[in-house]
Amino acid sequence: MDQEIERVVQAIAIASEPSQSTLFQEALNYIQGIQENANETWRLALQIFVATNGDQGRKYPPQARFWALRVLEEFLENKFDPLDPETFQTLQQAMMSYIQSEYVQGPAEANAPFIRNKFSHTLTLLFLCTYIDQWPSFFTDLFSLIQPSSQSSSTGLNRHISLLFFHLVLEISGEVADQMIKTARTWSAVRHARDGRVRDAVRERDAARINEAVLTIVATNVERMNALKEGDGDSQELGNSIELVDWGIRTFGSYVGWIDINLTVTPTTVPLLFKLLADSSLPIRLATSVALLRIVAKGLKEPADKLQLFKVLSLGQVLDALESKTAKQQRERGDDVDEGEESYREALGKLLNVYGLELTKLVEDAPTDDIRSDASAALVDLQPVTLRFLADDYDDTASTVFPLLQAVLGSYKRSRKVSSGPIDDQKRSFLSALLQVILKKMKWDEEAEPDDVDDDDNGEFEKMRKELRTFMDAILTIDQDLVTDEVRKLALQTISAYQSGTSLKWNDAELGVYLVYIFGEINKSGGKGRAAFCQTPAVIDKDKRKVTDYSEFPLTSHGEMLLALVQSGIVSYPNRTVSLQFFETVTRYADFFKVRKECILPALEAMIDKRGLHNENQQFRIRLYYLFYKFIRESRHEIPSQIALTIINSLPDLLSINVQLSEPEDPESDPLTEAVKSPVFESQLYLFETIGILTSTLSKDTEEQGNLLLSIVKPFMEELLANLQLFRAGSQDLVPVVKVHHIIMALGNISKGFPDHPASTTSENYMAPSFKVFAEIAQAILVCLEAMNVIKPIRDATRFAFARILATAGPTVTGYIPPLMNHLLAHFEPSELVDFMNFISLLIHKLQKDMFEVLDKLIAPLHSHITAILSQAASGTDELRWQIETKKAYLNLLVVILNARLEGIFTSERNSASFEALLGSLLRIVEDVSDPPSQKLALTFFGRCVTVWGQPAGSPNPELGGNLPGFERFIYEQIVPTAFGVVALPSFNPKDGQALMVIHEVASLLQTVCKTRGSEAYDYFLSAFLPSKGWPAEMALDFTTKLRDLDSKNFRKYFTELIRASRSS
């Protein structure tokens, strides 16, 4: 074996230095094979770990011995039954001999401390599989070693064995009782049962002695520690004592949750724990707080016992005193942050939180009034210190009591639902104090820099603010007036202080504005729209709202706050965070400016000058672009034409389009695709849309409007042409292409700011001058597209811009659609065809009859294009998915055409010859059970066809549709047989969810046929079609009757059951 061991040790050395040898992988595979074969190789590993030299030092290097422990762990990890006697004796004797030589007589792995922890875990695994039946004396054997020794005579206890004992108990507790560890590993019923048996055995045999040993070692070392502190003793000895106390309390805390509480909470342990909770050593204090937390959280069967435990502990008083003490120390430190001491306050907060939660459980679940009363009183006593923790400047500490506050407020809310009477004074006092703390905590730290978007602390503050809002909302549901009155008072005080010239910190100013911002959310009794800001009569007729002078009505509380906000000039506070919060607030409550129109101008002035859009900070401006857009959009009807002109004239410098190329983050990505994704430009687009909105408000003077629009877009079209010429000249620079893309998008957004073209206008000259400008824009964009249609971003931008221009200018520009289609489809990617058809569908929805001529030219080539695509075999899942999406978009387009009553394009002189082929291709889609969504759309199309062309000759209601000669034969000979046939196909699964949609659509189609053709259709089903399919006369009559008499919902249900029943039979 010695030679094999030497080979293994050598392989471990090679595998530990991957860069040093070409044999690394071979060595690694060799030792991994040994580890995976642990059932056969554990003896070898054991020898490597325990072997000694002649001087009793360890024979093999630490990394080899560490690996040996891993093999032993592999061997023991899943042993849930006793070991065979020989294996057990070998392991037991080797381990005890090792402990005797290394921990009792030796240095306890002083040169390789990492082995100590690994050995503790290995020995724990051996304990778990042998304690119950083979090694019941495990702890007795261990206790016998914690005896005086020459190297530890000063304390009377062996320090190394004491620490090993602590580590072992910690490991054992982790394995058999730590829920976090259990949750992290794969569930095993055998392991779970074994762990339960081990817990029971420890409780029965050794729990008392384990607890006694732990507390004896702790108490002895506490005494020693105090003596050394008082006598200015040896620092090494003091450190050793502190280490033992620290690990001893950690060990105590590890088992208090699963052994008898009468062992751990005694007249001796409680004073010891509270003494250590205030010890000068931070690790000891932290360990003690955890131990106390676990005692408090321990489940006891009887609520009375839990309450008695709390009375014995008197934890509320202790925590109150410690909070006061640590808060005083915190104040004395000032700006000198002590992370350790802050972690101690956090630990105290966690202890308080768990204690409070346990009290709330007693209040909620107590079986007697006495227990409930005592627990409730203790909980009330805890409230002041809870609020002090919440008020801590360190959010990690403040957030420790969040669960307790949620529980208390939840209890108050439940009580409020039961009783509508006034809140008792104690609760109201607590809620008022809590609200004060919340409002204070909602302030930014004075040293914070909210402008820094990369500062993680800013994100944490925003998160904290949201958490605090949930508490405020909870108080709101309990006592709304308390919250609204306090928020209103603080906001108005802050605004008034600024207006009067009182010195005001920026974070106080920001909070004041923020409270106005959230007031609309918390003021649940406020009205909607204008009624939220002024006290209007109960009802104002809809036709009188536009002429009503709302300035005559008194303001609501929120209206008064907004008026004070605007009039105070606090937007000018020399801090961008305050200004931004102002702009966020006035934008959110744009309806206020409809009742106090005199406030519009000062708000707009602030938005436009250096306080807003012209601020030097780019991130600030980016947000302002959107807020300005939103404010103008909501207030456009209140802005006089002259003001709109003034605003437009103040913005030209902000409309300049700058292209800055940077290196793509992903080297594999397309540089142009990355270049057009500019967050700055995407925000700037809001500004272009705002220009469009403002220009559209000049509709009373259409000539002036048209001239203004031309003056705005002309520079962009000139720049468009200049960059197009650079591209045509063969420039390899991306900048001209990006510029063209950006300008097209900008022009599209200017168009977007105009209202949609009305379905019918009262004047032929409706905005005619502006429409002429939009036609010029469309022409300029088409010229660019013709030259650059190989570039996808240009095609995407063009499609977007044309959607907006067509929606605005309507029939004036529909003539550009055919060349637009030709250029867009000359080069396209799969997704673009879907986008194009969705684009046409949108235009049909907006322009209706004005799209007839365009669609008449479009439908035949588009159908050919789609047919060609769908006829190709898909080469992979991506292509198959694209084909399905293309099919759905095309079917949806056909349905949209029929819904818009543009069916004439199918039967026009241009398209009538190909109409039958189109119908045939759609019938084949109905028959394709591999794509149920497309089946459903095709059936929907045929349902509309029946309504449109299937009306009987001389139909009394021409609005429903017309009569296409011969179409009734197509209904009976093609549509109905196909619809019936698809649900009868062997491959059609009526139980599938998507197939169910198809069944419902077939049912709807059949009812449409009957309702459209009347008695002729019923006779056809009863006398011809159903008998031809072999239906008995009685069954055919029942079906036809239900088809005629049931409403659509009930017939769908009947038809579904019929299809499913036919399959099962």
Curated annotation (Swiss-Prot):
Signal peptide as annotated in the record: none
Subcellular location: Nucleus; Cytoplasm
GO MF term set: small GTPase binding; tRNA binding
Keyword set, alphabetical order: Cytoplasm, Nucleus, RNA-binding, Transport, tRNA processing, tRNA-binding
Gene Ontology biological process terms from the UniProt entry: tRNA processing; tRNA re-export from nucleus
Any one Gene Ontology cellular component term annotated for this protein: cytoplasm
Record family assignment: Belongs to the exportin family.
PANTHER family per UniProt: EXPORTIN-T, EXPORTIN-T/LOS1
Role according to the record: tRNA nucleus export receptor which facilitates tRNA translocation across the nuclear pore complex. Involved in pre-tRNA splicing, probably by affecting the interaction of pre-tRNA with splicing endonuclease.
Protein's name in the database: Exportin-T
Organism in which the protein naturally occurs: Coprinopsis cinerea (strain Okayama-7 / 130 / ATCC MYA-4618 / FGSC 9003) (Inky cap fungus)
Gene name of the record: LOS1
